[in-house]
Each structure stands twice: as C-alpha cells, then as structure tokens.
Design a protein with these regions (language model features):
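Periplasmic c-type cytochrome electron-transfer domains
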Residues: 1-209
Length: 209
C-alpha cells in the first residue's frame, strides 16, 4: 500500500535536553525559510565546516561592544573590528572561519569579535569572568532570520532548548595525549608557554586568562 501501517515510539536513553535541542541544529524545515539550510550546514556535527564565510550586512550600522576586553590582542595586533577601535563592531566584518560549537559552556562573548555579547536576549558586559555563555548563545536567535532566512523569529523556548543542548556539547579528548596524562618534554614546554603567555599579556594592558 506504500503507506505507514504502524508507528511505534521506542525509548531513548538520551536526556531530554539532547532530544529537544538537537532538532534545532539539524532540522532545516523548522529553522530556515525553505528547508535548505540548518545550523548544521556550517556547524557540521556541532563542529565546523572549515570554511570562511563573508556574512557582513551592508544595511546594518556600527554597534558598540560593552566589553572592555582588548580583542586586538587575540588577533596579535590586527584590527578585527574594522575601524581600529576595538569597542566598535562594523557590520562588514569580512570572511571569518566557522567556529565550533564544542566546549562553548566555558566561553562568554561569542563570535570572532565577541559581538554576541549584545543582542535581543540581553547584554553581557563581560568585564571579568565568569562570562555569561548562555546569554551570548541566546543572542544567536537573530541568525535564524538574518542568515537562514526564517520568515519569523524563532520561539524563545526553542532557542532556550538549542542553547541548553549546544552548551552541553563537549570538546573531544586530545587523541595523542598519553593515557596517564603525562606530557612529553615538548608538550610541557608548550603548556608553560601557553599558560604563561610569555609576556603577551602586557601588550595591550589586558590580562589573558
């Protein structure tokens, strides 16, 4: 008859936060205008497609970043905000690599420029840790209309489910680290360099944690 005769729902060991939120990552019919794109189109399996996209909006205006963090330090001196003023966010930001969704629970202002610290869900001044990763991710609700072309705003309850799901995505373990967590001499030197910043924390007067 080419028809479904019966539908049985099987039990799942997955937590509701996973079941409810995963749909928002993959369901293009719910998240976009015509069902051709979802968040997972670029954030493949919650990670990255390794592509740089130019998603600037020429019709938008320059906005201000509430954080006092010196984002030019993260770029090793280049101006990631366009005007040279690290407190301004120019709408034409140029091509930027898709960032991973893994391990976001320990982040605050999201995006390469930290611009998601500001949005319809509120503002995180991000002056010092702990930063509000949940608020910053909730501000991505605008992307469903601006990037995916959704005809109307995503319901706040859906965005909350997506936020809870995404912040639960963990980064995978280091595949080359020893099982006993011991470090080779080269790895130990790299760890000391990374945690000590080797003087880089004084370049712009902003501490690096």
């Amino acid at each position: 008859s080419r028809r479904e005769r019966q539908h049985l729902r099987l039990s799942s060991p997955e937590a509701p936060v996973i079941v409810d939120g995963r749909r928002l990552l993959y369901d293009a019919t719910h998240s976009s205008s015509n069902g051709e794109a979802s968040c997972a189109s670029c954030h493949v399996f919650g990670h990255t497609d390794q592509l740089a996209w130019d998603l600037g909006n020429p019709d938008a205006g320059v906005t201000r970043l509430p954080s006092s963090i010196k984002f030019n330090l993260a770029a090793l001196g280049s101006n990631v905000n366009g005007t040279g003023n690290v407190g301004e966010l120019h709408p034409l930001k140029g091509p930027m690599l898709t960032q991973t969704l893994r391990g976001l629970a320990y982040h605050g202002p999201m995006h390469w420029r930290g611009d998601r610290a500001v949005g319809v869900s509120g503002t995180d001044p991000a002056t010092e840790p702990p930063f509000d990763a949940s608020l910053s991710f909730m501000n991505f609700i605008a992307a469903f209309e601006e990037l995916l072309g959704r005809a109307e705003p995503l319901p706040t309850a859906d965005m909350r489910a997506f936020t809870d799901f995404s912040l639960a995505i963990a980064a995978p373990p280091n595949p080359i680290r020893a099982l006993d967590n011991s470090l080779t001499p080269a790895q130990a030197r790299g760890r000391r360099f990374f945690l000590g910043c080797d003087g880089l924390d004084t370049r712009s007067g902003a501490p690096v944690d």
